[in-house]
């Protein structure tokens, strides 16, 4: 599937037509170079890559190893919004990857992810997602206790402030503070999408913050963008000492792949590649993931 963005418009005028079988743009001395000719040169090469790629891969194929995963034991912990009068949302994300301990229970865990109320309408409290490492003081407690204070095993700095190891940095809600949510993950890789080989960054999404009885289609949302120097300052000319320094350069065509979830009844795949399907917490590999290569 070719890109959907039409570049044969002002100001790009990319009128490349594969039916004409033009394989090169032959620039000549004494003839001014047209902007469209520079763009068309790229389109000729892209058409060659797309023709080869389409012969090998189906749209949405994973080309360079990455992986998609589903976690239906994504342990959530709701925290009080402030600690000694300080809004914990100011610093809580600095604790991601850190080992924490419950002062009352003795339970140890590592913070994997943080979700704030302003980031997700389904969340009313600052919520951390943890992987539990050890049970508590009596070897029977496996989750943090409601209302208990938690400390970190190492110093954490935010701004000019340092929270020292062993200091209380947050407290759990007094009731129903712990539960089990669900999440999906994708690791870094390259996917063949719309004739291009697109880098995908490592991403994660919380499917359901406090329950793991999830039912969704999970995959990649495709966004095509035109990026100008106003969007990305690195596109201003960096040739310091020359007359064109700091002038806006050429625009860029960009494709971004973002991990998202869709309702299982949503069949609109116009800008979506399904990678897996979850039905009542049961995982099913999508047809697209099962058969991504040409036979």
Indicate residue ranges for each PLM-predicted region.
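A generic structural motif
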Residues: 77, 121-137
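Hydrophobic or amphipathic alpha-helical targeting/insertion segments
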Residues: 144-152, 221-230, 234-264
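Ser/Thr/Gly-rich low-complexity blocks that favor extended beta-strand/coil architectures
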Residues: 90-123, 137-166, 216-218, 225-229, ...
């Amino acid at each position: 599937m070719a890109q959907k963005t039409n570049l044969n418009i002002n100001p790009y005028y990319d009128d490349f037509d594969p039916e004409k079988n033009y394989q090169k743009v032959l620039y000549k001395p004494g003839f001014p170079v047209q902007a469209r000719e520079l763009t068309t040169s790229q389109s000729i090469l892209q058409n060659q890559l797309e023709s080869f790629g389409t012969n090998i891969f189906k749209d949405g194929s994973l080309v360079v190893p990455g992986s998609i995963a589903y976690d239906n034991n994504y342990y959530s912990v709701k925290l009080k919004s402030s600690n000694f009068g300080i809004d914990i949302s100011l610093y809580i994300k600095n604790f991601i990857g850190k080992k924490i301990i419950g002062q009352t229970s003795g339970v140890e865990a590592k913070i994997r992810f943080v979700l704030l109320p302003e980031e997700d309408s389904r969340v009313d409290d600052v919520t951390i997602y943890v992987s539990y490492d050890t049970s508590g003081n009596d070897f029977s407690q496996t989750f943090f206790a409601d209302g208990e204070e938690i400390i970190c095993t190492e110093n954490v700095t935010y701004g000019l402030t340092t929270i020292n190891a062993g200091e209380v940095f947050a407290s759990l809600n007094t009731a129903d503070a712990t539960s089990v949510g669900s999440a999906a993950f994708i690791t870094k890789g390259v996917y063949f999408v719309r004739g291009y080989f697109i880098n995908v960054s490592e991403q994660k999404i919380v499917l359901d913050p406090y329950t793991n009885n999830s039912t969704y289609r999970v995959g990649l949302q495709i966004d095509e963008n035109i990026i100008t120097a106003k969007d990305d300052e690195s596109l201003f000319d960096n040739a310091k000492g020359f007359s064109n320094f700091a002038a806006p350069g050429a625009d860029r065509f960009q494709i971004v792949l973002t991990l998202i979830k869709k309702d299982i009844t949503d069949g609109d795949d116009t800008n979506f590649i399904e990678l897996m399907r979850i039905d009542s917490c049961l995982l099913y590999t999508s047809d697209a993931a099962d058969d991504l290569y040409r036979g």
